[in-house]
């Protein structure tokens, strides 16, 4: 890159160099190269060159090189500054992600500064380098940047950082045509419009010397007006001089790819722009039919159909397509040598399909589009699919150890449509004037937009009101729901409280019972004791009788003993009471002492507080006096402040007035300047206009003069010849003179205008001078006012300083006052607290005094009692002495009595021993009884608790039982209904069998009749043949007779006449026979047609009856299993299945499997659609139902024989490349015999089977050559079988779908296993099914594999195919495989 020479003179250089014209021109050329946005060395490219170099070199391993380190030290900082100044992703707010592809994503963004909405495409540099495809984005950038066509999405700017490339493009809110086709049934009128726009858009691309190569509805976007624009130019390729392209890889989307592009993957890649017209034909077919013309489930099928397009292209009978449309599609979908558009776009435009009254090829973009998108705002993205957030980690370049140059391929990518760098050229000024006009136009448009936005806001308000109403209704509903829930919770709480109360009641009852038991026990004890007492009394009476003599003495002794015991007891109680009183006296004295000490302490504290209070009161008085003085000072200060504020406000008003005057002066100055500039502009414009008009007039005069001279010359030459035209010439001359006079008057007027303009200019000059003088005077006044303002500001500052000082003093004083007030409050609080303490202590003291007085009174009473007790005790002692003396006298008597007593005692001891034995027995029994009773009580308690629990359980069980009873009742009812249904079904089956038999009999009759009719037909045909032969013979005979030469004899005339008569008779007979035969033929043909129609109807009825029979059989099978389960359940008193049920691992019975599966549906969308069907697998059949109602009504949608199953397997991505990647683990495939299928009527035609010559047969396989552009492995050698851009040649079996390298076949390797599928492809069908989960898919596959017969089913040679040979919904659903690149504004 050569640097431009510096502007200054080089030292030592000759002067001639600086003024060299050649050097200046070279500099201008260099400048032009730098300014040119298409130049590889423009300003942005140069800046891009520095930035990636720094990014690629700024690594520790590379910095070890001294040269690199010096370079980085020199340019690192400036490059960072450049990055900060250039546009970056942070300049935009991301609204939503509207598309995601292999290399990045498309975001809907709003520019922060201008608030404009754009679509921003992000391309990962790492992904592009990793996939070695870092060149496709250049075509896309260049086309969008430099196309300048209304048919191409515009690029506003492109920039980059170290991770991504960014392309800020025009946002297309209408979405793509895939979205339009999925939302609308496209009529031919619309298809005509969109095809025309696509043709014009492709013509624009072709005129740029490029071929698109990936034309499809995904890359056709609609703007806000509904008009079409092309996008995704990553596959574009530059044409050579001959308008052709050389390429060895097949590029594009499989459904839209042309045969010549497909052939290019074999190395014959040489084709032209006609490949794009093929794609237009596919697109038109898809719009009119709803699907692509060469659709197949597999990639191989699609490619084979495209290559065999002559045979595989067919139009469905039910599609309403005009002849012109069919003709255009066929003209596009043909060989490239004869394809429409090969000789230019004009032959397409002239096709009769495009003829209409509404638009033509020139004004199509100005006409209203068929569908104008309804947008709620400028960021409305309702026409784009919602894209899930990408939670994956962003991959970046690893840190290199040597120079790699990862950023170098992206140098020069940066582009700005409105480039402001180096924009001081005259062309830029012209651009500015154009821009100003554009701005004015945009302002007008904005006004219209504002009106529309106001209308929109009113609509939105109405919508919000409706939403508020909805919300209010919803809130009411929620309130009602909440109230319901609260009532339910209340009910539950009440029920729980009831249970608790029942528990408590039961416990209380238990306690009551226990107490009753104990009372009973005590009563029993009492009775026992009473009985013992009675027995003892009896014994005592016996003893009394025996010991009458000793009774008196013992009684006396007992009395004395009792008296002694009583006195001793009294003494003990008195001593105890005395001790207690002493203790209480001691404790009360201690308490009194403590209270007295507390009282003293409180009195001391009170004295101290009173002294402190006096001090505080004094301080408070002093502070109040200080406060009053401060207040006086403050009022004085506030008066001073008010005065100062008044002065300041006056000064401020003066300043404001001065500013207003200044502003007025400046305004006048600006107005005058503007007026001056306007006048200058007017003057210049007038001068330019005048000069221009003068030049124009002069030119016209010169022309008129030359013409006049020429006419004169011509007139002079041709006067003799054209004498009659002299008058006309003179009139013309007069007109010319008039024109000249008019031109002269115009010239005079212009001169007058010029003079007036000059006068005005002179007046304006005078005005300008005056205004300048005024401005100078005003400036002087402004300076004076500025000085006054400065003085005033100084004064204001001084006053403000003083004010601040006074305010600070005031603040200090107020703070001191506040602190004093706070301390006063605290002291008051403390004083109040102490007073409260004192009051409480005084109350305690008074209470203690009362207690002490009470205690003293009690002490006196107790002392009196003591004295009385002591006196009594002395009396008792004397009595005891006397009694002792009496006792001593009586001891003698007692001794004698004791001897007797001893004898009695012995007897008594023996009786006591016996009594003790009985008592111990009674005690042990009593203990055992009590223990037993305690255990019983515990058990009873447990029993009550258990009973409660049982009650609760019973309540629950009652509910459960009621529910179970209900279920049992319902089951019984169902059982009854089932039994009745079984009976009915059996009857129905019998009836159906009878009907079947009758139908079969009728069929046999019809067949017999058909056979007889055929025999009759054969007879008639034979008769016809005989008649024809007779006729030919007769004709030949006649020809012979006619060709014979007539003999001369007269006698033969009679023979001739006779033969003529015979001939006429024969002709007559022939005619009559012909008429008879034709009548008979018509009659028998009618009968044949009627019989065939009857047979078709009967066969349809038979199929329907057979399907209903199959469904009934499966229902009977299910009912039988349910009956068995019910019987087992009733026997074992459980509802669950018994041990006898043989169930599979998945919970279903071994013989039966049922659930929801989805079949592929074909409509006009680009995504794989599925329709749910309820599938039942019985022991013999697989039944498909549209819904559970159809199942109940025994109306199956399709029935398959299990005996006719060939193969069941899970699919791979290559088998269903159109399906979503998430759905593939849930899809499986069933292969079955054609005759084992019963279905409802066909809506779509059966796809034609390809020719067998295209298949390579090997080991039972039927291989189809193909290529894989997405991850696939060879099933023979397990090596990769794919590549993104140059995949190896591959083979795929159309029977078992095994995939392998083509080299294995070419080298005749024995790696390839033989084909596992043994069936005739012409008599077999495949069916794709989608399960709800991968587990369900595995379950279905495993269970169906078990049901496949070991021997493959032999095809029935006599089986007739049903007239209803397909389902309502076709199996082969159109799934669009995404293109290689990411399209703008939409998911790719």
Swiss-Prot record:
PH domain ranges (all copies): 1150-1349
Ranges of residues in domain RhoBD: 979-1047
Region (RHOA binding): 979-1047
Site (Cleavage): 1131-1132
InterPro entries: AGC-kinase_C, C1-like_sf, HR1_rho-bd, Kinase-like_dom_sf, PE/DAG-bd, PH-like_dom_sf, PH_domain, Prot_kinase_dom
Job description of the protein: Protein kinase which is a key regulator of actin cytoskeleton and cell polarity. Involved in regulation of smooth muscle contraction, actin cytoskeleton organization, stress fiber and focal adhesion formation, neurite retraction, cell adhesion and motility via phosphorylation of ADD1, BRCA2, CNN1, EZR, DPYSL2, EP300, MSN, MYL9/MLC2, NPM1, RDX, PPP1R12A and VIM. Phosphorylates SORL1 and IRF4. Acts as a negative regulator of VEGF-induced angiogenic endothelial cell activation. Positively regulates the activation of p42/MAPK1-p44/MAPK3 and of p90RSK/RPS6KA1 during myogenic differentiation.
Subunit structure: Homodimer. Interacts with IRS1. Interacts with RAF1. Interacts with RHOA (activated by GTP). Interacts with RHOB and RHOC. Interacts with PPP1R12A. Interacts with EP300. Interacts with CHORDC1. Interacts with BRCA2. Interacts with NPM1; this interaction enhances ROCK2 activity. Interacts with SORL1. Interacts with PJVK.
Entry protein name: Rho-associated protein kinase 2
Native source species: Bos taurus
């Amino acid at each position: 890159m050569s640097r431009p020479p510096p502007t200054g003179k080089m030292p030592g250089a000759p002067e001639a160099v600086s003024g060299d014209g050649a050097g200046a021109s070279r500099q201008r050329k260099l400048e032009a190269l730098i300014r040119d946005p298409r130049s590889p060395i423009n300003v942005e490219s140069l800046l891009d060159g520095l930035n990636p170099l720094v990014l690629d070199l700024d690594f520790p391993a590379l910095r070890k090189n001294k040269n690199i380190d010096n370079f980085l030290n020199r340019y690192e900082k400036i490059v960072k500054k450049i990055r900060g100044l250039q546009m970056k992703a942070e300049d935009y707010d991301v609204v939503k992600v509207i598309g995601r592809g292999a290399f990045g994503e498309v975001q809907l963004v709003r520019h922060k500064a201008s608030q404009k909405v754009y679509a921003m495409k992000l391309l990962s540099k790492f992904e592009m380098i990793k996939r070695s495809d870092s060149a496709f984005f250049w075509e896309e950038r260049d086309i969008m940047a430099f196309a300048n066509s209304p048919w191409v999405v515009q690029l506003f700017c492109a920039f980059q950082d170290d991770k991504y490339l960014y392309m800020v493009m025009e946002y297309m809110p209408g979405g793509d045509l895939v979205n339009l086709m999925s939302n609308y049934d496209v009529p031919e009128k619309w298809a005509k419009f969109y095809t025309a726009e696509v043709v014009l858009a492709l013509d624009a691309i072709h005129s740029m010397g490029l071929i698109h190569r990936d034309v499809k509805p995904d890359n056709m976007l609609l703007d806000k007006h509904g008009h079409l624009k092309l996008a995704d130019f990553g596959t574009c390729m530059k044409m050579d001089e001959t308008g052709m392209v050389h390429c060895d890889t097949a590029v594009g989307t499989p459904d839209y790819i042309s045969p010549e592009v497909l052939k290019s993957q074999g190395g014959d890649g040489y084709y032209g722009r006609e490949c794009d017209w093929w794609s237009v034909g596919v697109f038109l077919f898809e719009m009119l039919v709803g699907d692509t013309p060469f659709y197949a489930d597999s990639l191989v099928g699609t490619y084979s159909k495209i290559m065999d397009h002559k045979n595989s292209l067919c139009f469905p009978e039910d599609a309403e397509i005009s002849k012109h449309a069919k003709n255009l599609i066929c003209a596009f979908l043909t060989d490239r040598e004869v394809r429409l558009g090969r000789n230019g776009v004009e032959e397409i435009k002239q096709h009769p399909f495009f003829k209409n009254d509404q638009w033509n090829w020139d004004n199509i973009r100005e006409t209203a589009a068929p569908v104008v998108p309804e947008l709620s705002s400028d960021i409305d993205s309702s026409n784009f699919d919602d894209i899930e957030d990408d939670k994956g980690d962003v991959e970046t370049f690893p840190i290199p150890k040597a120079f790699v140059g990862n950023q170098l391929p992206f140098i020069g990518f940066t582009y700005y449509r409105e480039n402001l760098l180096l924009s001081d050229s005259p062309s830029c000024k012209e651009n500015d004037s154009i821009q100003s006009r554009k701005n004015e136009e945009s302002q007008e448009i904005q006004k219209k937009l504002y009106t529309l936005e106001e209308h929109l806001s009113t609509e939105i308000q109405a919508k919000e009101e409706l939403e508020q109403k909805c919300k209010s209704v919803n809130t009411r509903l929620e309130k009602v729901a909440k109230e319901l829930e609260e009532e339910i919770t209340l009910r539950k709480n009440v029920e729980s409280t009831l249970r608790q109360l029942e528990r408590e009641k039961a416990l209380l009852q238990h306690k009551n019972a226990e107490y009753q038991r104990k009372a009973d026990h005590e009563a029993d004890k009492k009775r026992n004791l009473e009985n013992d007492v009675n027995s003892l009394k009896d014994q005592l009476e016996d003893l009394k009788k025996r010991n009458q003599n000793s009774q008196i003495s013992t009684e006396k002794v007992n009395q004395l003993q009792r008296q002694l015991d009583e006195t001793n007891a009294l003494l003990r109680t008195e001593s105890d009471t005395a001790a207690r009183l002493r203790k209480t006296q001691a404790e009360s004295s201690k308490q009194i002492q403590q209270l007295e000490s507390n009282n003293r302490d409180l009195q001391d504290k009170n004295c101290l507080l009173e002294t402190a209070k006096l001090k505080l009161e004094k301080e408070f008085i002093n502070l109040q006096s200080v406060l009053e003085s401060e207040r006086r000072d403050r009022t004085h200060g506030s008066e001073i402040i008010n005065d100062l504020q008044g002065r300041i406000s006056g000064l401020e008003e003066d300043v404001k007035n001065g500013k207003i005057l200044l502003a007025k002066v400046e305004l006048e100055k600006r107005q005058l300047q503007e007026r001056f500039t306007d006048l200058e502009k007017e003057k210049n414009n007038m001068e330019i206009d005048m000069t221009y008009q003068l030049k124009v007039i002069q030119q016209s005069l010169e022309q008129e003069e030359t013409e006049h001279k020429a006419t004169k010359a011509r007139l002079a030459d041709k006067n003799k010849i054209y004498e009659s035209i002299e008058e006309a010439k003179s009139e013309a001359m007069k007109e010319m003179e008039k024109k000249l006079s008019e031109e002269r008057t115009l010239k005079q007027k212009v001169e007058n205008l010029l003079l007036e303009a000059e006068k005005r200019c002179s007046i304006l000059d005078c005005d300008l001078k005056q205004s300048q003088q005024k401005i100078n005077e005003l400036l002087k006044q402004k300076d004076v006012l500025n000085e006054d303002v400065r003085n005033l500001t100084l004064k204001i500052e001084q006053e403000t300083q003083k004010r601040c000082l006074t305010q600070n003093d005031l603040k200090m004083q107020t703070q001191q006052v506040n602190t004093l007030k706070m301390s006063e409050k605290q002291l008051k609080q403390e004083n109040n607290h102490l007073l409260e303490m004192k009051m409480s202590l005084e109350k305690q003291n008074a209470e203690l005094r009362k207690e002490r007085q009470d205690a003293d009174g009690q002490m006196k009473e107790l002392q009196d009692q003591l004295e009385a007790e002591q006196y009594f005790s002395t009396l008792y002692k004397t009595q005891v002495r006397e009694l002792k003396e009496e006792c001593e006298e009586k001891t003698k008597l007692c001794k004698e009595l004791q001897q007797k007593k001893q004898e009695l005692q012995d007897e008594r001891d023996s009786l006591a021993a016996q009594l003790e034995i009985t008592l111990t027995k009674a005690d042990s029994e009593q203990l055992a009884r009590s223990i037993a009773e305690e255990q019983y009580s515990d058990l009873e308690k447990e029993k009550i608790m258990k009973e409660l629990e049982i009650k609760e359980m019973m309540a629950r069980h009652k509910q459960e039982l009621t529910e179970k009873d209900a279920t049992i009742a319902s089951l019984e009812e169902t059982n009854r209904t089932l039994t009745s249904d079984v009976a009915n079904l059996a009857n129905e089956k019998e009836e159906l069998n009878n009907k079947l038999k009758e139908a079969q009999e009728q069929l046999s009759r019809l067949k017999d009749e058909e056979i007889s009719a055929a025999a009759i037909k054969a007879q008639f045909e034979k008769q016809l043949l005989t008649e024809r032969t007779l006729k030919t013979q007769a004709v030949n005979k006649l020809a012979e007779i006619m060709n014979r030469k007539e003999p001369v004899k007269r006698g033969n005339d009679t023979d001739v006449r006779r033969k003529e008569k015979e001939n006429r008779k024969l002709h007559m007979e022939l005619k009559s026979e012909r008429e008879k035969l034709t009548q008979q033929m018509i009659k028998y043909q009618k009968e044949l047609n009627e019989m065939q129609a009857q047979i078709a109807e009967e066969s349809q009825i038979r199929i329907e009856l057979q399907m209903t029979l199959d469904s009934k059989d499966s229902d009977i099978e299910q009912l039988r299993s349910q009956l068995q389960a019910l019987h087992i359940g009733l026997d074992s008193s459980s509802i669950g299945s018994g041990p006898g049920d043989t169930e599979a691992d998945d919970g279903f019975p071994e013989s039966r499997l049922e659930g929801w599966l989805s079949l592929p549906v074909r409509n006009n969308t680009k995504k794989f659609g599925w329709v749910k069907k309820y599938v039942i697998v019985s022991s013999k059949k697989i039944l498909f139902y549209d819904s559970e109602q159809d199942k109940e009504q025994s109306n199956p949608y399709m029935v398959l024989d299990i005996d006719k199953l060939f193969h069941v397997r899970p699919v791979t991505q290559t088998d269903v490349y159109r399906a979503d990647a998430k759905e593939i683990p849930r899809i499986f495939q069933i292969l079955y015999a054609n005759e084992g299928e019963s279905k409802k009527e066909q809506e779509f035609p059966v796809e034609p089977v390809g020719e067998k010559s295209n298949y390579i047969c090997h080991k039972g396989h039927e291989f189809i050559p193909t290529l894989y552009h997405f991850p696939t492995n060879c099933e023979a050698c397990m090596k990769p079988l794919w590549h993104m851009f140059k995949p190896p040649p591959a083979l795929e079996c159309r029977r078992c779908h095994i995939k392998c390298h083509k080299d294995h076949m070419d080298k005749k390797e024995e790696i390839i296993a033989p084909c596992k599928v043994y069936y005739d492809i012409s008599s077999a069908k495949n069916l794709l099914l989608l399960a709800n989960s991968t587990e369900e898919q595995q379950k279905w596959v495993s269970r169906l594999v078990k049901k496949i017969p070991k021997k493959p089913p032999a095809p029935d040679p006599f089986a007739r195919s049903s007239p209803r040979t397909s389902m309502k919904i076709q199996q082969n659903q159109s799934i669009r495989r995404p293109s290689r690149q990411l399209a703008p504004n939409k998911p790719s």
